[in-house]
Amino acid sequence: MTDKKFILDTDIGDDIDDAYALDFALKKNLPLLGVTTVFRWADERARIAKKMAVLYGKKLPVYAGLKGAWDADGHCCQWTADLENEAYAPDNENGIPSDAIDFIVQSAKRYGKNLVLLAIGPLTNIAAAIEKDPSAMSGIGGVIMMGGDYANQYVEWNINCDIPAAKTVFSSDLPVTAFGCEVTSKFVVSEKQQRYMLNMRGSEYKKYLSLLTNLWLKSKLPGWRICLHDVMVVRQASENYCDFAEIDMHLETESAYTYGM
């Protein structure tokens, strides 16, 4: 996949697996064009992603995207005061004349089939890019996403956060490779691995990732284990390690009882 370029579209700042997905991309030196953030506190999410990139030593454009239709009181659960630092501001807050949707569309025009979108949050940004320039978006290499459940009658979180956007993406001409929750929910770390993730030492980057992990875990019930759903998407982009079955996908939006399934 050496010719491929990737954009990571993420709701980093909720579940901790988004942070580890970005961590995996950084450590594997995945050819990321940039990161776009989505859903409710998109600006704060962008600051978290930007801080990770800065502490890692990577020059990586980060764009705050669309917040969606949900209310957004308060802050991301990982929000801390030091994210106010200008060094961690999203690029479209620091004078770069592009927003997340423009960035996706312009990348689609430039890279065509070599561009793959890694969607590990609600599909709001990607649907907006499709609606803005369907011609450019239809020419990209596809979407690898974490979202949905293709074995059970269940409305998965990323789909539920913007069901109309998911409908737009699934109804488009884009090739979609999806990791459903019925698969990703098996990617639970061991107790030993979790202790390491909670107590990383060394670089400021490792300490920050460990801090995010601890802040996230405080919001969970005792004994909660980390599940790295979103890492599977980035690993697939890096290693192409999974086999897939092709299915006909229909997202229900007519029935009140099965809406989003």
Language-model features, listed with the residues they occupy:
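Conformational coupling and interaction surfaces
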Residues: 2-6, 20-27, 31-32, 160, ...
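A glycine-rich helix N-cap at a beta->alpha junction
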Residues: 52-66
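Metal-dependent catalytic neighborhoods of phosphoester/phosphodiester hydrolases
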Residues: 43-53, 72-75, 79
